[in-house]
């Protein structure tokens, strides 16, 4: 069994961060060692919540504890998501350094969660700068959305060609795989009823589209689900393209179930059979 140290947010109610990623990854046969960066009552897009940011020292202590019982050599990947402070970025890098010492083949997937002007997504000051300065140079995989891609590269991105230039800039900095979630108005198809996503590697760029469900309130945690299931499929031995397609069909099933149930929260439990055996078969097209 493959193991992932997943360092991201936790919500008591609902599905975001580790709550969104853990169960689907376990369904796919990958164990998740969940280490929380924050513990909130619910995700921040409700507009009100309670809870706390986990002190950065606690992350280091937990990682050291895993090393003390000689378990870091069993860690196949590090996954990072929502961070509660810029200082936590340093602890992510500490965790990566320790894991790589024990298992040089371990992967690092960085989901660079950043504040969004149209969403109540509260991210601490300095996180963006710390991710750009410290995470990009060491990440094997990054999974930004379109807004986060703009912030990471500081490129103006309005067209599909702009997206390609931006992802190639990240690849040039050493990131081996870049997934850009929900291209929106910068998509290749640019249809409001279509969800578009790309995967870029040094070997090329692949594009995939599927229906975009029109929720009254867009569920949170979809990016966490995408990052987690893509990583799980890679660890299960699938090729880049196979993992990209599998993830998209698994996530499509979760979104379909969530929409049909009229839920604001992702319905990963209700959609468990869609994760295990997706009913859709969307395929990726190489576009560059």
Swiss-Prot record:
Q: What cellular component terms from Gene Ontology apply here?
A: cytosol
The catalytic activity, as recorded, is: pyridoxal + ATP = pyridoxal 5'-phosphate + ADP + H(+)
Q: Which UniProt keywords apply?
A: ATP-binding, Kinase, Magnesium, Nucleotide-binding, Transferase
Q: Where does ATP bind?
A: 111, 148, 181
What EC identifiers does the entry list? 2.7.1.35
Pathway(s) the chain acts in: Cofactor metabolism; pyridoxal 5'-phosphate salvage; pyridoxal 5'-phosphate from pyridoxal: step 1/1
Q: Which GO terms describe its molecular function?
A: ATP binding; magnesium ion binding; pyridoxal kinase activity
CDD domains membership: pyridoxal_pyridoxamine_kinase
| Cofactor(s) essential for the protein | Mg(2+)
Enzyme class of the recorded protein, top EC level: transferase
The record's Pfam families line, in alphabetical order, gives:
Phos_pyr_kin
UniProt-annotated binding residues for substrate: 9, 44-45, 224
GO BP term, example: pyridoxal 5'-phosphate salvage
Its assembly, as annotated, is: Homodimer.
The family classification in the record reads: Belongs to the pyridoxine kinase family. PdxY subfamily.
User: What does the UniProt function comment say about this protein?
Assistant: Pyridoxal kinase involved in the salvage pathway of pyridoxal 5'-phosphate (PLP). Catalyzes the phosphorylation of pyridoxal to PLP.
What name has this protein been given in UniProt?
Pyridoxal kinase PdxY
Gene name, per UniProt, is pdxY
